[in-house]
Amino acid sequence: SLILFVYARERPPQRTQGRELSAAHRIKEVRTSFVGTGIGMVMGNKGAVGARVVLSSAVPGGRDEVCTFVCAHLAAHDHNVQRRHAEWRAVCERLVFDPMSVQVLPPLQEPVSQEKPATIDAVDPHAYSLYDTHHLFVLGDLNYRLATGVEGVSPAGRHTAPGTFPPITRGDVLQVARTFESQRWASLAPYDQLVRERFAPTPRTMHHLHVPDMSVYHIPPTYKYKARGEMEQLSTKRLPGWPDRLLWGSSDASAGNQAIQCELYRSIMRYTYSDHKPVTAIVQLPP
């Protein structure tokens, strides 16, 4: 199952007088949607849920700003790369935010503001895709694993000369896994399936989104650990990898400029109640 929570922080009046309002005060509309991509490309064991949030401008007379959040869970297993591509295409095509999906906004807490009655009227009568937004955030268990038996590519998207990252084997990966050294984990980043598919000569998936470079952040694999085991106790039943991701894109982005700036990207290694490690990020939106 999938669930997505979107929170907006309130700021007290003394923090907002003469300055931009807090995000909670600026929310004009929230629409939600979901799509199943599991069995028969319709069942909900795989798929995505999304929320489209419209915020009024922080500057008087400025444009509204739209942030769209999508939580996805794509097909599992190392070999199912093409299935993951197909499921993401289905999400892009079928995750639609129509006027009927508008949600009632929860009231802000007193004494921050004097609340008006909640409304479920849509801002406009149009339906929108996940790309009809200023900022898009995609998160969840995307299930892209490590690719063995093939050459790697530069995680930064630079041209990769043949032989730069020679093929690795399952044994190579497991040897690195036994050491659990962050610098050695970085050496596996060129073999991340998501990176290889994004930077293929003809990009195959998610090339419009920014994917944090694991060789820069030195994040250990987020999967597969022994649930309720030691903090760094990887399972030998699966190859480790980075299926759990936070990606983003902005309509203001240009070549070499992602617009959204990442201040922190990390995994929570102390969480041991699952065979996955949660991933968190702090990003700054452009003014």
Q: Where would I find each of the regions flagged by the language model?
A:
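Active-site-proximal beta-strand elements of phosphoester/diester hydrolases
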Residues: 5-6, 32, 65-76
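Active-site surface patch of divalent metal-dependent phosphodiester/phosphate bond hydrolases
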Residues: 1-42
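Catalytic lobes of large eukaryotic enzymes
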Residues: 18-21, 42, 49-56, 62, ...
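Residue-level marker for the onset of beta-strands and adjacent loop->beta junctions
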Residues: 3, 47-49
